[in-house]
């Protein structure tokens, strides 16, 4: 069954989509599925860029055999050694034992850790600035360490002006029959997933992404071929601008993300009152229950919005546990350039605002508003003035 797609006259997509996997990296929910992309270049010397996840092995090998036909496979270029892209290396080398595996020194260190058989592979070690010529195509290797593993390489092709970008510019989401971004309404179909993918998978490494973007800026890029999601051949500047914002922790919008935690509904009522007040002031606010929303979606909202409002009860003398997990994720990912407004609820000893302030103070270039909200057990009409003042401070931030 035909599972390959032509990108150019001699570059083919030979990947597969997975709609059965429930959690990417066994962490992040992906109800939209995911694609594992691999690319074949049919030149005087044939080349495959990366393999795929073990879950799609049958489809992948069928695709590879289809595009190769009776030809030999000359090179397997490994840009990224994460198992969702490298799991079939030993399978490919078993089918094509004369193939030369291309990577850098770290690539081969990791490869032998995953596959002891890799010690016997034919290898070509490359580094930043090296090239691989296959006939019409010449691939220039660009080091992109920690985007998002230390061994990551990018490859730029002189002939097609394509950037093989490893995990950079990728997204969650299976492909629905088309492989090109311009075959979709990308902002509707993929943008939220793309942002969530970036923020949670790559977000910690903004400085390293910036370094890679600076290298890419000197290239005439006409296509971007990532290891997840659709291929870009139009409007590439739009995607690069998104990555510029995301990697510099620059909000995409003035909108407000309000995240609350509530045991019995009383803190929820306070959060709803704050959201209502912000709407009355013309602000766009999105409200999220921290207990009912996977933290990866909340992290995506942090990357999107300028202002983050956090309201939750004190729990066992600490921060409400789901909110604490969210805070820990923000700190681990190095969130920057945001404004935080904090509220708390407690029946006898509310102290969440202080504890959240202490945690958030570890972040760079953030503003924590002095005006806070404290509810004792439940929201009452006597609290309206405090709610209004809290709303005003957020609206003016």
Question: How would you label these PLM feature ranges?
Answer:
Residues 4-64, 154-157, 161-165, 267:
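Conserved beta-strand hairpin/beta-sheet module of binuclear metal-dependent hydrolase folds
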Residues 5-9, 103-152, 208-211:
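Metallo-beta-lactamase
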Residues 44, 55-102:
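Active-site metal-binding motif and surrounding structural segment of the metallo-beta-lactamase
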Residues 45-47, 75, 137, 161-164, ...:
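Structural motif
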Residues 49-51, 73-81, 101-104, 163-167, ...:
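Active-site neighborhood of phospho(di)ester-bond hydrolases with catalytic His/Asp-centered motifs
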Residues 88, 294-298:
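Short acidic active-site motifs
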Residues 148-152, 168-203, 247-251:
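Active-site-proximal loop/helix segment associated with metal-binding centers of metalloenzymes
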Residues 175, 186-224, 228-231, 273-288, ...:
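FMN-binding flavodoxin-like domain, especially the glycine-rich phosphate-binding loop
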